[in-house]
Design a protein with these regions (language model features):
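Catalytic phosphate/metal-binding cores of nucleic-acid and nucleotide-processing enzymes, i.e., regions
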Residues: 49, 231-237
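Catalytic core of the metallo-beta-lactamase
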Residues: 92-146
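Active-site metal-binding motif and surrounding structural segment of the metallo-beta-lactamase
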Residues: 23, 32-76, 143
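Cap/insert and terminal regions of metallo-dependent hydrolase folds
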Residues: 138-226
Length: 238
């Protein structure tokens, strides 16, 4: 399986997850549709579907365009609003060879979902734009994490106009570390850190601190154009 970052950060977020069979699932679509098509090497036929965490444009910008192309888009926050669900309701969706469990995480009053994705015998946890995660997936034995680390507490300026939104709607380093620790196991192979604030993160420090939590895993930072081959621990690398 291959994970590719097309965009990450406050200007837009979009990733692709491609299975061994060649099916691609788009994770958030917060960039112009032409950028998504380019990131797919213009091969739209390979796209099984798209999942969107929440309504903010840096995550959802192109979802109408994707729907107009006949591609299935899973927007659980809309479905949950439609049924007036409380914060404990989860939804499950099957898209091609991907099974996606959506669960709710707090984002400063905006309905927002994290995803646990099952594909190729692996479990991938995707969390972004959250204050904290109210769930543990320890028993699931997650293989891969794509998780936000938006700021470090001692690097943030409390006079920022969006300070309250940042602390109530985004993940601080200690919170990210706590989520990794809670869900860590010998099965965890990669922790990819995303949606990192330019002025509020020290990448080297964050990688080093998360590595202490999961020494067996590869810890890396998401950047546009970067990709990772995701394998289970017992999978042959050749």
């Amino acid at each position: 399986m291959k994970l590719t970052c097309l965009a990450t950060g406050s200007s837009g977020n979009c990733y692709t997850l491609t299975s061994a069979a060649g099916e691609t699932l788009i994770l958030d679509c917060g960039v112009p549709i032409k950028d998504i098509k380019k990131g797919l090497d213009w091969n739209i036929k390979c796209v099984a579907g798209c999942i969107v965490t929440h309504e903010h444009k840096d995550h959802s910008l192109s979802f109408y365009s994707i729907r107009r192309m006949g591609i299935k888009v899973f927007t659980p926050y809309e479905d949950l609003d439609r049924i007036e669900a409380d914060e404990n309701v989860m939804l499950t969706e099957k898209i091609g060879g991907f099974t996606i469990k959506a669960f709710q995480v707090p984002h400063n009053g905006t309905r927002n979902c994290g995803f646990l994705i099952y594909a190729d015998g692996q479990k991938i946890l995707y969390l972004t734009d959250l204050e904290y995660c109210p769930y543990s997936f320890k028993n699931t034995k997650v293989n891969q994490m794509l998780i936000e680390c938006n700021y470090i507490k001692d690097m943030i300026n409390t006079d920022l106009p969006n300070y309250i939104h940042k602390v109530r709607g985004h993940c601080e380093l200690e919170t990210t570390k706590g989520i990794v620790a809670t869900n860590n196991s010998e099965s965890l192979q990669n922790v990819i850190l995303c949606h990192m604030g330019v002025e509020t993160c020290d990448n080297d420090r964050i990688i080093a601190e998360v590595q202490k939590i999961a020494p067996q895993a590869n810890i890396d930072v998401a950047e546009a154009g970067k990709s990772w081959i995701l394998r289970k621990g017992d999978e042959c690398p050749f």
